[in-house]
Amino acid sequence: MNNVLKNAGLFLRLFWLRFQQNKLSQAAGYLTYSTMLALVPLVMVVFSVFSAFPVFNEVTDELKGFIFNNFAPQASDMVGQYIDEFVSNSKQMSAVGVISLVVVALMLINSIDRTLNSIWHDTTIRPLVFSFAIYWLILTLGPLLIGASIGVSSYIAAMLNENISLPFGLKILSFVPFFLTWLIFTLIYTVVPNKKVKIMHSAIGALVAAVFFTLGKQAFLWYVTTFPSYQLIYGAMATLPIMLLWIQLSWVVILIGAQLASVLADYTLCTQGKIRVEELVAADTHEPALQQKMEKTEQTLKTEITQQKQRLEKQG
């Protein structure tokens, strides 16, 4: 029992130190600002990609519903009108205008990339061509994956609504949207950081983020429907603070999930006695000696694990 409490205290201490170091609330604010600037370009790019694939024509309305439910509670009519105007105006833009919007969208992806890598305290810089290729794949393949997931979720929801007497095994399918959110967060925490992240750590951080994201969405929707005082204060401009607040909360949840995945790796080193919390935190000042010690510690752990596996195989 004492060991459990001691380990829990160590983990919470390390998490709190990381939270203060990473300044997650400020990082979330920065990403919120970047998201608002890149929102129109992203919407334009996403729907342009969908228009190039007729199979996703029926998914367009579902995607709008997804945006309303996740990023614009109680503002669906106004946001829907804006989206239609954005898509209509994008068809009349020149090549230079389209390129500039794509660049802004890529800048948002770059901001997310740098913010997540800062949580893992990785200063490695990818080659420019490699980074551009990754960002472009995210920008083009991302909408297709989102469209596919929304299509599957909509199909399952329709099936469940039509037949309420489905067996329990099939009713579990109603959790597919949650599992898709969990999968997306896991992929983000695994692929985006330059450091190698264990899939178990990514999955745990993503699970916590997905749970808080889902609960937060329901709580936020309940708040804006139960206490509509913001409409009296802001009037026709009420959509803007609603979206700003929800995007801010969403980024806080996503970054906390990323930090949890990062802290799990640090926590493992500390519990094995390979490095102290003070040394681990001090290493993030990028002092070469401490950085080298951390790298050496990780390498030593890998060697010990390999040797232990070899001994077990011989004994077997």
Curated annotation (Swiss-Prot):
List the GO terms this entry assigns under cellular component, sorted alphabetically.
plasma membrane
What InterPro entries does the record tag this protein with? UPF0761_bac, Virul_fac_BrkB
Tell me yes or no: is Kinase among this UniProt entry's keywords: no
Task: Enumerate the transmembrane spans.
Answer: 36-56, 92-112, 128-148, 172-192, 204-224, 236-256
Keywords attached to this Swiss-Prot or TrEMBL record, sorted alphabetically, are: Cell inner membrane, Cell membrane, Membrane, Transmembrane, Transmembrane helix
Top-rank taxon of the source lineage equals Bacteria
Its localization reads: Cell inner membrane
Stated membrane topology is:
Multi-pass membrane protein
Regarding protein family, the annotation reads: Belongs to the UPF0761 family.
Protein name, as recorded: UPF0761 membrane protein PM1616
**Organism this protein belongs to:** Pasteurella multocida (strain Pm70)
**Taxonomic path:** Bacteria, Pseudomonadati, Pseudomonadota, Gammaproteobacteria, Pasteurellales
